[in-house]
Swiss-Prot record:
Compositional bias ranges of the Low complexity kind: 220-237
Pfam families: Ribosomal_L3
One annotated GO biological process: translation
Family to which this protein belongs: Belongs to the universal ribosomal protein uL3 family.
Function: One of the primary rRNA binding proteins, it binds directly near the 3'-end of the 23S rRNA, where it nucleates assembly of the 50S subunit.
Signal peptide (residue range): none
Protein name (Swiss-Prot/TrEMBL): Large ribosomal subunit protein uL3
Record keywords, A-Z: Methylation, Ribonucleoprotein, Ribosomal protein, RNA-binding, rRNA-binding
GO MF annotations, alphabetized: rRNA binding; structural constituent of ribosome
Protein source organism: Brucella suis biovar 1 (strain 1330)
Post-translational modification: Methylated by PrmB.
GN (gene name): rplC
Region (Disordered): 133-155, 213-237
Residues bearing the modification N5-methylglutamine: Q151
InterPro entries: Ribosomal_uL3, Ribosomal_uL3_bac/org-type, Ribosomal_uL3_CS, Transl_B-barrel_sf
């Protein structure tokens, strides 16, 4: 199990494939994605890596977090997240993960906080059909109707679909296809929409319901590894 990455949602656009078909994509940007800390079985009881992305002002960073980043020899980060990994995919502290961590055609799971819609009625929140527009209807056009039953059971069951706060929840969209990556600019283009507003931090992981492509880098797509491969290619030429 490899580590995921933290990316920032820039927005949506479209690209064209080899067949000339237009594909809607969401652009995710990775900015200075470094390994900040490790979690090991001996010390923590499980194996994981803590990643940090972005840049935070030193004056806005607490003294404890300054020491945490200094220990890893990385600049203060705007966002931290932890990813469980297998022991053979544990990464060293301080290394940078690039967009080449994913390959075109790979399936990924994307996690983000959905856009908040405020207090919404059942027609918007749960796609209810509503009531009649006329013919005896009295100000219940968009109402949900009955909520309970009779004396037995004499209550409203938990989970009843009703009006309430919509959005602003943690959402994971599974099996999204990676269309392409741009390591130089740190961009990942995925097919379709992902949860979250523009500028939101998104967690991208290998899909749990799809196999990992054979050409996916292990333990991760690292910045130093990319440079080494480029140097080796130039030397061979």
């Amino acid at each position: 199990m490899r580590s995921g990455v933290i990316a920032q949602k820039l927005g949506m656009t479209r690209v064209y494939n080899d067949a000339g078909e237009h594909v809607p994509v969401t652009v995710l940007r990775m900015e200075n994605c470094h390994v900040v800390a490790q979690r090991t079985v001996e010390k923590n009881g499980y194996t994981a890596v803590q990643l940090g992305v972005g840049v935070a002002k030193v004056k806005n960073t607490s003294k404890a977090m300054r020491g945490h980043f200094a220990k890893a020899e990385v600049e203060p980060k705007a966002k931290l997240a932890e990813f469980r990994v297998s022991p053979d995919n544990l990464l060293e502290v301080g290394v940078e993960i690039t967009a080449e961590h994913f390959v075109a055609g790979q399936k990924v799971d994307v996690t983000g906080t959905s856009i908040g819609k405020g207090f919404a009625g059942v027609m918007k929140r749960h796609n209810f059909g509503g009531h009649r527009a006329s013919h005896g209807n009295s100000i219940t056009h968009r109402s949900h109707g009955s909520t309970g039953q009779r004396q037995d059971p004499g209550k409203v069951f938990k989970g009843k679909k009703m009006a309430g706060h919509m959005g602003q929840t943690r959402v994971t969209t599974q099996n999204i296809e990676v269309v392409s990556t741009d390591s130089d600019r740190g961009l990942i283009l995925v097919r379709g929409a992902v949860p979250g507003s523009k500028g939101a931090w998104i967690l991208v992981r290998d899909a749990v319901k799809a196999s990992l492509p054979e050409n996916a880098p292990k333990p991760a797509g690292l910045r130093a590894g990319a440079k080494a491969e480029a140097a080796a290619t130039e030397g061979a030429e």
